[in-house]
Structures are given as structure tokens and as C-alpha cells.
Amino acid sequence: MARIHPLSAVMSQNIGNETNIWQFCVVFPQARIGDNCNICANVLIENDVIIGNNVTVKSGVQIWDGVEIEDNVFIGPNVTFTNDLVPRSKVYPQSFARTIIKKGASIGANSTIIAGHSIGEYAFIGAGSVITK
């Protein structure tokens, strides 16, 4: 059974066993989170997001539509994902660029992942990096 802090707004029923979701998180209804994950405080997870098993997402991360995170991934604090390559206020694309974080990857604190890229298996992204290709 998942453990969800009472001060979080978790609307999804797709939360795996032994997953912890801490305070002030928001998880949209169609998000999918695997088993044995740790979703730290102040994390936002949108609808078109898939998170595998044994994933850690540290505080201050927003995971927007179009992001897939495979098993055994570490996402450091305040990592920023983007999902729209040409963002405009009140203009919504037909679909968002897909971003895939492959199994075992580690993304350091305050890194930015520009939409539409894949991070390879067991890759290590240093703190403060900006991934553009």
C-alpha cells in the first residue's frame, strides 16, 4: 500500500505499493507512479507522466505532461523539466515533446532538461546542468 501524506493532493489511483508521497505534492488523476518510489515534498506530477519503480524525486520538482521516468532513477532537488519547445501563454500544442529518463539515471540538483530528449541508461547528470541535446 502507498503512503500518502494528508497534506498532499493525490488524485491518481495509479500509485504503486510501498510508494511514499510527502506533504504538499500534487499528483494529477492520470499520472502513473510505480512501486517503492519516494516522492518528496512540493512535487507536481501532471497527467501524461509515467514514473517507474524505485524512483526518487526530491523536493521542488515539477514533472510536466510528456515525461517518462524509467526504473531506479534519481531526480535531484529543484530539477526542471520542460515540455513545450515554443511556449506561449494560452496556446496549447496538440501534443508535448516526449522526454525519457532511462533506467538507473541520476539527475543532479537544479538541472534543466529541455523537452524532447532522452537521458541514457545509468547516465549521471551533474548538478546545475542544462540538457539541450
Residue ranges and their predicted role:
Residues 2-133:
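Structural signal for interior beta-strand "rungs" in well-ordered beta-sheet cores
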